[in-house]
């Protein structure tokens, strides 16, 4: 497991649903990986392969929406998506450096993430994305971000053409898929 203090939380996150070691290897080491695949059961062997590759590179690795498996496999942490509203897990079962991060789209979901004890809240979508016509825009993003004292990460629709607009939002960092898929961006 990578060691980092809460003050050294990652600022850049790449969501993956498949594993391409060559692609991940080309990313800057400061980019953390969130493995998110809701279509099939998680394959522990695959997750351990991703973990090993991330460890070799000094990269943080989070598993989406499976807290028990992330703890069992001694990962850096878990990502709780906005639809995960469970607050009945026992935080004392976590290792000292285990980090919970999660996403929200509204003030109500931000409050749930606060109750879950997340260290970072991913607010999304910042910009228009293919799967949804609703998006925050920088003004709405900043209004939502002001509703919490937890550090926020910008997520959704970030690409080369709107990347400079990230300067308009008050975020600790950003996360994405398409931005990191295009290797020319990094």
Residue ranges and their predicted role:
Residues 46-62, 85, 90-106, 134-157:
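Alpha-helix-loop-beta-strand connector modules within alpha/beta enzyme cores
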Residues 3, 21, 27-93:
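N-terminal active-site wall of soluble small-molecule enzyme domains
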Residues 1-23:
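N-terminal amphipathic alpha-helix/helix-capping segment at the start of soluble metabolic enzymes
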Residues 27-30, 73, 116, 147, ...:
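Structural motif
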Residues 10-16, 31-35, 61-63, 78-80, ...:
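Hydrophobic faces of well-ordered beta-strands that scaffold small-molecule active sites
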Residues 14, 33, 70, 113, ...:
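Conserved, mostly hydrophobic/aromatic
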Residues 21-31, 110-123:
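Alpha/beta enzyme core
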Residues 81-89, 120-135, 158-186:
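Glycine-rich phosphate-binding active-site loops on the catalytic face of alpha/beta enzymes
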């Amino acid at each position: 497991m990578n060691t980092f203090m809460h003050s050294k939380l990652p600022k850049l996150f790449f969501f993956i649903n498949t594993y391409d070691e060559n692609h991940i290897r080309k990313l800057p080491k400061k980019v953390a990986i969130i493995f998110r695949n809701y279509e099939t059961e998680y394959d522990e062997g695959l997750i351990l392969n991703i973990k090993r590759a991330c460890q070799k590179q000094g990269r943080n690795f989070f598993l989406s929406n499976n807290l028990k498996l992330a703890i069992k496999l001694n990962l850096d942490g878990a990502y709780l998506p906005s639809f995960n509203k469970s607050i009945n897990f026992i935080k004392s079962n976590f290792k000292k450096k285990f980090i919970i991060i999660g996403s929200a789209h509204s003030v109500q979901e931000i409050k749930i993430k606060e109750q879950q004890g997340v260290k970072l809240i991913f607010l999304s979508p910042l910009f228009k994305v293919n799967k949804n016509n609703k998006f925050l825009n920088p003004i709405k993003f900043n209004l939502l971000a002001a509703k919490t004292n937890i550090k926020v990460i910008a997520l959704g629709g970030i690409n080369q053409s709107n990347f400079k607009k990230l300067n308009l939002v008050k975020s600790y960092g950003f996360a994405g898929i398409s931005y990191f898929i295009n290797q020319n961006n990094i």
